[in-house]
Amino acid sequence: VLGQRPGPSTGLPTYTSQTELNFALSAGQGEFTRFIAAPSDAEDSYYWAAVSLNISKKFRIPSILLTDKTICEGLFNFDIDSIREIKSEAAQVPAFPPDKGIMVKANSYEHDVSGITTEDPVKTVQMQNNRLMKTKLLAEELEKYETVKCFCNGKPDTAIICWGSNRPACEEIGKSLGLKVVCPMVISPFPIDAFKTALKGIKRIISIENNATGQLGALINSYGIKVNDQILKYDGRPFSVDELEAAVKSKL
């Protein structure tokens, strides 16, 4: 769980932000598949935490629940019985010491499929390709989940893009101003097909984030989707509905 607050260094440790999306996407040595979910409230957090654990077990990859202090220390209520069951789908049950009759190997060095250290160039390429293949398989797996949430009335031509704890306030603004609200639940692998489907008929995009550089907006731009305007807040405080409504109106 990565609960974001303002930095750098100690920063504002008791306030909130959305400043570590890029860090979550790139932290670590080398190139490998990772799963990142960005819940927008307690119900999402409960659900995607279970999905994250399942995906890590099934694909043997790290999962990050990218949240923020607003959610981490917020008070929510929801019907826990409404959350559909997430069944474990681990391909294999990992072995743990001191299980009898097995050998447990954990090797951070490059290794072959048997876990034996190797520096062979052919095997190195094969193992790297195997790791990267998980990205495609994971993207296919995620098609059965609601990886992008949408909220709208009618057929608006302007959309608000948000993520994390900004979603509830954006949804309220969307209803009052007649805008579509699009909120990705998954950051990596980014659900670009579902995201493009959500933006059908949209001519103008406004990105709303709690950071200074528009990190989600930059990620969206990298997929060839133009973000027309940004509303960025980075004083450590979450958006209030009133200030956000005024900011959105100024962009329309």
Segments predicted by a language model, with ranges:
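A glycine-rich helix N-cap at a beta->alpha junction
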Residues: 1-5, 88-91
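Acidic, glycine-rich active-site loops and adjacent beta-strand->loop/helix elements
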Residues: 2-10, 41-43, 69-71, 185-188
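Short beta-alpha connecting loops at secondary-structure transitions
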Residues: 4-13, 31-38, 228-233
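Glycine-rich, flexible loop/turn motifs
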Residues: 8, 17-20, 144
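Short linear motifs at secondary-structure transitions and domain/linker junctions
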Residues: 9-14, 38-42, 132-137, 180-183
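Glycine-centered flexibility motif
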Residues: 11-12, 20, 27-30, 95-100, ...
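Conserved thiamine diphosphate
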Residues: 15-68
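Flexible, low-complexity linker and terminal segments
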Residues: 53-252
